[in-house]
Amino acid sequence: MSLQSIKYTRGSLEILDQLLLPVQSKYLPVRGVEDGWKVINKMQVRGAPAIAIVGCLSLAVEIHPEEFDSKKSLRQELEGKLNYLVSARPTAVNMKMAADELLSLANDLTKDDNVDVAAMKQRFLNATEAMLKKDIADNRAIGAHGAKAILQLVAAAAGAPMAGPVRVLTHCNTGSLATAGYGTALGVVRQLSELGKLEHIYCTETRPYNQGARLTAYELVHEKFPATLVLDSMVAALLRAKNVAAVVVGADRVAANGDTANKIGTYQIAVVAKHHGVPFFVAAPLTSIDLHIPSGDHIIIEERPDREMTHVGEHRIAAPGINCWNPAFDVTPASLITGIITERGVFQPAQLKETITKLLET
């Protein structure tokens, strides 16, 4: 059974505090937008899909007991709070996409004379809750498309009609803890396992916040997958020695040309995968694809505090006085990406803008 990182019923939201894992499993109440902003900014919840879900649900929890005297005042409240939530971690596009979608709904309802303020609030709550259900369904579709693509590539390379069990590498955390459930890149791994086609999954530690060691390893042990943790600096040796069939990572933002922002360290894994001829896949929902930016050069990269590099918990591990550069993400060029796995299929980066534009029109 997958881990549950988000517990929601109308008017109530709790999130699993990921800063305490794997030592302690503790759920935190999120009573409104201020709590939502804090748990996102402090990375007590992380992963682009989960950030969007928790952000939107924190707003739903806040407005649930409130009464508004007009649709205009409700719309203004929603706009201000959604914009505030987007600022918590700006690199991940999913929160911005969700905010735009909900604000568009609010604008339409404000103009609709057949909808009163109570009905408008109800429609807004329904829309946020629908996002939670859709994320899980989308993740399962991503898993199915990704597993199929990997197995087809492996079979074709071997000149065989069917691929045997495969070894896969992933980076950071993209499972149930990073989404509403099931996972994106880890959802692909989960689907391979369900098909009996997963021989082994390798996960990186993912310095400096150790999401791989703390979170992905925690999920893999929970699921009883055959899994091994490796240091970030071991990836080249791993791909050379262990017959890894594919690399699958998540994404915080994908540009129109396929350039992909993901957890720091992703870029160097893609370079090494290219050198060793290992397919490199990005698994992400359509909400992570930002067609408004032409390339990765336009993606804002969040920089995190020095302390995340210099300390582990309360213990300093770096020399006092040393300067630090701590970008949370890097951008992998589209030329290094074999395919982008979405809930609607697997696309080559060069096809992305045209294909996604057509899908969104249907």
UniProtKB/Swiss-Prot annotation:
Catalysed transformations (reactions): 5-(methylsulfanyl)-alpha-D-ribose 1-phosphate = 5-(methylsulfanyl)-D-ribulose 1-phosphate
Subcellular location(s) of the protein: Cytoplasm; Nucleus
EC nos: 5.3.1.23
MF terms in GO: S-methyl-5-thioribose-1-phosphate isomerase activity
GO cellular component: cytoplasm; nucleus
Gene Ontology process terms (BP): L-methionine salvage from methylthioadenosine
Name of the protein described by the UniProt record: Methylthioribose-1-phosphate isomerase
Organism: Drosophila persimilis
Higher taxonomy: Eukaryota, Metazoa, Ecdysozoa, Arthropoda, Hexapoda
